[in-house]
């Protein structure tokens, strides 16, 4: 009995351990299933090619793991944080006459450049420590930026929830009914996703973004059979009818507009990536302790390397035509549940994702999802992004009674949200169209640096005064 109990405690795989082939394959498939819904959702929302997005996530993951010397088991997937910036850029008047591939090419350049933000942050952390980054990007900036990323997408979510865009068979006299039924589909998707996320446990609890849309599609199918109203999207003429086809690769096109729009958003992913590496450190060291491993897995000390890997992932994804991304918390949770942290598993998962991206029938099924289903999902996801921003400030115990903090948070929030709803996402400023989220982030960073000058001096004076008083007290006692 004692031997059996001891054996049970040692179940699991550390980053440098490799399961047997059949286990390796099963664990890898599980990781693909976990990352799939969110990665695909970003492609559907931004208009990027689904097949290319899936392929890019796999390729970027392999590059991330190799660059981090196979020490950090994280999966790279598309990030919702960039959706506003990419969407505003691709919908801008400057690119109005461009084809989809031309718009993606412009966005790619901004995505590649955003990778430099994470790389620079990583180098700073490696050289000066984590505190150096937190001085420039405190929670009073990263939190509100995450909030406005979510809130500026609220209009898109509600519009898509009742949209008939690219829908199939909808007659003119059925438009009113079809719109109402689209609301039903989006609400079913939203509520089922929420219920699944709250009540499902274990590995199943990591898949609400998969199960919610499936239920929404089932309702859309019932509506089609009962009323003849087809809410499923019509495939474009460019859709392949074969079994296998290579993803659509595009080359980046240099554009300063893309740099201004997308590059600053990388600051919002740094706290998330930081939290992930510390979370992973706890899980892996706990498993190592239970397995009585003599090796130390100090992942918390590899934050700089992790950020550099993230930046390289963005550059790789952007170069082939995929959206910007980050390492996925969903995959960390799946690893924590199964206690499988093997980097070999993630490499195989990445290869499987790249193979799946070439399977045309699956890609076509994903593309045909009703816009209402996507809209219902967006309500939950975009709200979650905003909530994450609040969580960042709560976790860092931001002083909401500080005049400086209130000033920084207030201006970021209003510039970001106001710019979206007053000017459609791009704020006109001296002949330039400044993307609202990027503009708010840059303004917040500069304002925080300016307002930090006075407090630093006051703090130094207070510290000097305290030291002087201590010396006087010591002299009095000595005498």
Show the residue positions of the predicted features.
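Hydrophobic core segments of alpha-helical transmembrane domains in multi-pass membrane transport
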Residues: 31, 39-40, 57-65, 87-89, ...
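Intrinsically disordered, low-complexity non-transmembrane regions of multi-pass membrane transporters
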Residues: 1-26, 167-174, 231-248, 282-305, ...
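Membrane-embedded helical hairpins/re-entrant loop segments and their flanking transmembrane helices
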Residues: 13-15, 19-22, 44-65, 268-343
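Transmembrane helix boundary and interhelical junction motifs in multipass membrane proteins
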Residues: 37-39, 75-82, 322-331, 344-345
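Flexible hinge motifs at transmembrane-helix junctions and intramembrane kinks/re-entrant loops
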Residues: 45-50, 177-181, 185, 192-279, ...
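Membrane-helix interface "capping/anchor" motifs
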Residues: 66-76, 132, 197-208, 338-343, ...
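Early transmembrane hairpin of solute transport permeases
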Residues: 22-186, 358-361, 368, 372, ...
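Transmembrane alpha-helical segments and their short flanking loops
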Residues: 2-22, 45-48, 83-101, 348-477
